[in-house]
């Protein structure tokens, strides 16, 4: 079994970092370069940076900022937001970013995912699927453009399609659990595990290291991501970048 990765997720809005609750209610939490330096010191396994302003507004990626983040980062860095074509993806990887993350592309131009996987290698292409519980249904619906647009596509169906397109990894991102810190969507994660033959990273809902421990030990998930857990501390959610030390991290694994 591969060693699980504990992955902080940082949300960019323009040049600053924010944290959201259910993809809204953005709260400014600081400078991205400073956050990267702190995660360097804490020896995070990997770091994911998602530019939600680029995703919402359909803007080009902020290449200057991405390059600065990549130069600062001493851990594997994944970037998502505004990536629509092969040239953009290739440029971002040329900065030293390890993986690019796409989301809306899986709905709006799925063939581009296959093209990226062919030219860049599947290991460099990650598809993030933002999902929420459908009204009056037990199924989960996929949303795009940072949760602002419905697709009518069910989560399980898109997962199968993304695998066939050649993506190397899927991020399951729960809109309902985002920023709530009440725990991950365990039942739907189990269901997706049963149909998914590529690595899964789970995001949305982590409020404690126990939530991460349960995901790793009960489900065998090898990619566990969190936002609020690693930028807030205490019941009043004071902004404080944090990450488990070596001893605490070892306790999460079987």
UniProtKB/Swiss-Prot annotation:
Its EC number is 4.3.2.10. Its main location: cytoplasm. It is found in: Cytoplasm. Transmembrane segments: none annotated. GO terms for molecular function: imidazoleglycerol-phosphate synthase activity; lyase activity. GO terms for biological process: L-histidine biosynthetic process. Keywords: Amino-acid biosynthesis, Cytoplasm, Histidine biosynthesis, Lyase. It comes from the Bacteria. One of its GO terms (cellular component) is cytoplasm. The active site is at 130. It catalyses: 5-[(5-phospho-1-deoxy-D-ribulos-1-ylimino)methylamino]-1-(5-phospho-beta-D-ribosyl)imidazole-4-carboxamide + L-glutamine = D-erythro-1-(imidazol-4-yl)glycerol 3-phosphate + 5-amino-1-(5-phospho-beta-D-ribosyl)imidazole-4-carboxamide + L-glutamate + H(+). It is an enzyme of class 4 (lyase). Pathway: Amino-acid biosynthesis; L-histidine biosynthesis; L-histidine from 5-phospho-alpha-D-ribose 1-diphosphate: step 5/9. IGPS catalyzes the conversion of PRFAR and glutamine to IGP, AICAR and glutamate. The HisF subunit catalyzes the cyclization activity that produces IGP and AICAR from PRFAR using the ammonia provided by the HisH subunit. Belongs to the HisA/HisF family. Heterodimer of HisH and HisF. This is Putative imidazole glycerol phosphate synthase subunit HisF. It comes from Leptospira borgpetersenii.
């Amino acid at each position: 079994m591969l060693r699980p990765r504990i992955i902080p997720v940082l949300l960019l809005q323009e040049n600053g970092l924010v944290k959201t609750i259910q993809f809204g209610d953005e709260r400014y939490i600081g400078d991205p370069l400073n956050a990267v330096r702190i995660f360097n010191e804490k020896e995070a396994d990997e770091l994911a940076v998602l530019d939600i302003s680029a995703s919402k507004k359909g803007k080009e990626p902020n290449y200057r900022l991405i390059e600065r983040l990549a130069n600062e980062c001493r851990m594997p860095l994944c970037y998502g937001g505004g990536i629509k074509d092969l040239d953009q993806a290739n440029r971002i990887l040329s900065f030293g970013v390890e993986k690019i993350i796409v989301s809306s592309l899986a709905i709006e131009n799925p063939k581009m995912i296959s093209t990226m996987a062919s030219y860049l290698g599947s290991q460099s292409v990650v598809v993030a699927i933002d999902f929420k519980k459908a009204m009056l249904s037990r199924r989960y619906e996929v949303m795009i453009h940072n949760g602002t647009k419905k697709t009518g596509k069910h989560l399980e169906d898109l997962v199968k399609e993304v695998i066939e397109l050649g993506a190397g990894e899927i991020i399951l991102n729960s809109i309902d659990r985002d920023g709530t810190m009440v725990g991950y969507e365990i039942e739907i994660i189990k269901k997706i595990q049963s149909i998914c033959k590529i690595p899964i990273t789970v995001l949305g809902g982590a409020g404690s290291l126990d939530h991460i421990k349960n995901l790793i030990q009960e489900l065998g998930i090898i990619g566990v991501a969190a936002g609020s857990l690693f930028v807030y501390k205490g019941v009043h959610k004071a902004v404080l970048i944090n990450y488990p030390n070596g001893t605490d991290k070892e306790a999460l694994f079987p």
